[in-house]
């Protein structure tokens, strides 16, 4: 899918390294810079791919995800906002509406090291169908040798949220994640609380855990691709580790049957309590990703 995105015809060349393209229903922004290749969907301000020069793709994007208006994309970094997980009210979308609506590209800049982009979503008739509040939501990205993502919400409200990052791995059987802390809520086991005794999370089957006292940096150890990915979390309360395992992967229409083998989600999350935004002090959630060969 990522190769397909970069082979799409250019609709508008915004700068020498930034272009607008289209895949089915969705407008895309493609970064082709000497230091980095990346791509975004305007729907959801959704980072689809990020590849620093000399590295394998860092993010995972499903080959089966539809690029359709209003349908959440499977992979990359979905922005879950203004709620994380199932909606409190029946009939509303899981993980909020921000990932399903078109955002505006408000600013972009570039230098020798990479590209900076700012996307904006504002309250509208479309958002008030889901949520009554007035808001301005900004998503800032800095892509280069590292990837920096910051979500900033302006208004008067309480939210839960996540940067639901899907990371590309060689084989989930050979992946370990450290730095998660010890206590977690196990969503595969009736939301019971558990303890990670050795501080290392592996993924032998379906895994869905909300870590309650995570360290600032989660480290993905990938023995197959022979690299580590550092995921540094900012302004967060939790980290989520997720992999659907084989049975759920088969049941998901937007994922290949064996899709679970080649990704792990390590998510920057504010979920176990609400996060307050005020007019004076916007709420924030941020993630910095670095990759290194072992």
Curated annotation (Swiss-Prot):
Catalytic activity, reaction form: alpha-D-glucose 6-phosphate = beta-D-glucose 6-phosphate
Enzyme class: isomerase
Alphabetic keyword roster: Isomerase
Gene Ontology terms: cellular component: cytoplasm
Active-site residues, Swiss-Prot/TrEMBL: 164, 267
Residues the entry annotates as binding substrate: 74, 99, 208
Keyword Isomerase: yes
A GO molecular-function descriptor: glucose-6-phosphate 1-epimerase activity
Protein's UniProt keywords contain Isomerase: yes
Pfam families in the record: Aldose_epim
GO biological process, one term: carbohydrate metabolic process
Cleaved signal peptide residues: none
EC numbers on record: 5.1.3.15
Primary role: Probably functions as a hexose-6-phosphate 1-epimerase.
Subunit structure: Monomer in solution.
Record PANTHER family: APOSPORY-ASSOCIATED PROTEIN C-RELATED, GLUCOSE-6-PHOSPHATE 1-EPIMERASE
Family: Belongs to the glucose-6-phosphate 1-epimerase family.
Protein name stated in the entry: Putative glucose-6-phosphate 1-epimerase
Organism name: Salmonella typhimurium (strain LT2 / SGSC1412 / ATCC 700720)
Gene name tied to this protein: yeaD
């Amino acid at each position: 899918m990522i190769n397909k995105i970069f082979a799409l015809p250019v609709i508008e060349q915004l700068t020498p390294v930034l272009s607008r393209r289209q895949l089915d229903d969705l407008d895309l922004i493609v970064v082709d810079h000497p230091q980095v290749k990346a791509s975004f969907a305007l729907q959801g301000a959704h980072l689809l791919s990020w590849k620093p020069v000399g590295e394998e793709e860092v993010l995972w994007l499903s080959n089966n995800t539809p690029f359709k208006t209003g349908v959440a994309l499977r992979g990359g970094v979905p922005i879950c906002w203004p709620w994380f997980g199932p909606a409190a009210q029946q009939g509303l979308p899981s993980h909020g509406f921000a990932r399903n609506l078109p955002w505006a590209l408000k600013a972009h800049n570039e230098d020798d090291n990479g590209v900076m982009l700012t996307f904006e979503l504002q309250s509208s008739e479309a958002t008030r169908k889901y949520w009554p509040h007035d808001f301005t939501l900004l998503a800032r990205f800095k892509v280069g040798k590292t990837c920096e993502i910051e979500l900033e919400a302006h208004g008067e409200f309480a939210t839960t949220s996540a940067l639901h990052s899907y990371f590309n791995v060689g084989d989930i059987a050979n992946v370990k994640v450290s730095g998660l802390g010890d206590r977690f809520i196990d969503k595969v086991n009736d939301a019971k609380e558990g303890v990670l005794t050795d501080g290392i999370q592996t993924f032998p089957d379906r895994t869905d855990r909300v870590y309650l006292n995570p360290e600032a940096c989660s480290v993905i150890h990938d023995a197959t691709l022979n690299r580590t990915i550092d995921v540094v979390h900012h302004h967060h309360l939790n980290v989520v580790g997720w992999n659907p395992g084989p049975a759920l992967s088969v049941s998901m229409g937007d994922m290949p049957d064996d899709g679970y083998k080649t990704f792990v989600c390590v998510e920057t999350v504010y979920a176990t309590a609400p996060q307050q935004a005020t007019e004076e002090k916007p709420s924030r959630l941020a993630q910095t990703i670095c990759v290194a060969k072992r």
